[in-house]
C-alpha cells in the first residue's frame, strides 16, 4: 500500500493497545477496497483522551475507534449520540464530519450479529451478562432491542456497579426486556440463574492476556449443554471460559466474531463502503 498525501487517517484510542488486531484487520480491508484511508493505533488513557480528541479535530481525522478504558468517557466529547449509544452510555466509534463528531456503538450490534450468524435466535431468551463496562452494556442494550426477554447482569461492587444499575434502569424504561443487576460475589444467585439461562456472555477483560488463566465461572458444573457461551475477549483466542464451556458440552462463540462484525460496521460508517467480509475472514484466519 502506497500512502499518499490524499489519504485520511482513522485511529484507535485505547490503553493498552498493542494487542489489538483492529489495525491489521481494518488496513487489510481498506487496501482490498482500494480506499484512501490508513488506520493507526494510539495509546490513549482517560487522562489523555480529551487532548486526543482535540488532536483528532485539528488533524481532520476521519474518525477513531474507542476501546478500554475510554468508551464511557468518550460520550462526553461527541456532539451527537445514536439512540442505541445513549441507551448503552458508551461508544466505540467516532465519525468526524468536518469537526462535528458523532458517536456510535458497534460492539453490541457486532456481538449480537455473531450470535445470529451462528444460527441462534435470541428472541425471548435469557442472557447472563458478566460485566458492566462499555462492551458488556452495548451487548445488553442491543440484545434488548433485538428481543431478549431477560438480562441477568452480574458485576462486582466496584466503580461500575452504580453504572450497571443506571444502565438497567434505562433499558427497563425503554425496551420490553427486563434487566436485573446482582453482585458477582453472590455465587448462589449466579448458580441459580445460570441453571435456566440460554446465553452466558463474558463482557469483561477476565480471560484476556495477562489474565488468560482466569475465568469468572468458578465451578464448571454450573455450565450445561443447553447454554450458549459467548466471549468478547479474543487474545487469547480460546479463553479459559470457552475451554470450560466446551468441556461442559456448551456451544461457544469466540471473540473473533464480535471483532469481525463490529469492525465491519465501523468500516462502513467511516468510508461509506461495504466491508470486504469474506476476504478479511480469510486473511485474518477468522472462523466466524
UniProtKB/Swiss-Prot annotation:
Coiled coil (residue ranges): none
SUPFAM superfamilies per the UniProt record, alphabetical: Aminoacid dehydrogenase-like, N-terminal domain, NAD(P)-binding Rossmann-fold domains
A single BP term in Gene Ontology: amino acid biosynthetic process
Pathway stated in the Swiss-Prot or TrEMBL entry: Metabolic intermediate biosynthesis; chorismate biosynthesis; chorismate from D-erythrose 4-phosphate and phosphoenolpyruvate: step 4/7
Annotated binding of substrate, by residue: 71, 107
Enzyme Commission number(s): 1.1.1.282
Chain positions recorded as NAD(+) binding sites: 132-135, 155-158, 205, 232-235, 255
Keywords: Amino-acid biosynthesis, Aromatic amino acid biosynthesis, NAD, NADP, Oxidoreductase
Reactions catalysed according to its record: L-quinate + NAD(+) = 3-dehydroquinate + NADH + H(+); L-quinate + NADP(+) = 3-dehydroquinate + NADPH + H(+); shikimate + NADP(+) = 3-dehydroshikimate + NADPH + H(+); shikimate + NAD(+) = 3-dehydroshikimate + NADH + H(+)
Sample GO molecular function, one term: quinate 3-dehydrogenase (NADP+) activity
Cited function: The actual biological function of YdiB remains unclear, nor is it known whether 3-dehydroshikimate or quinate represents the natural substrate. Catalyzes the reversible NAD-dependent reduction of both 3-dehydroshikimate (DHSA) and 3-dehydroquinate to yield shikimate (SA) and quinate, respectively. It can use both NAD or NADP for catalysis, however it has higher catalytic efficiency with NAD.
Subunit structure: Homodimer.
UniProt similarity note: Belongs to the shikimate dehydrogenase family.
Name of the protein in its database record: Quinate/shikimate dehydrogenase
Originating species: Shigella sonnei (strain Ss046)
Organism phylogeny: Bacteria, Pseudomonadati, Pseudomonadota, Gammaproteobacteria, Enterobacterales
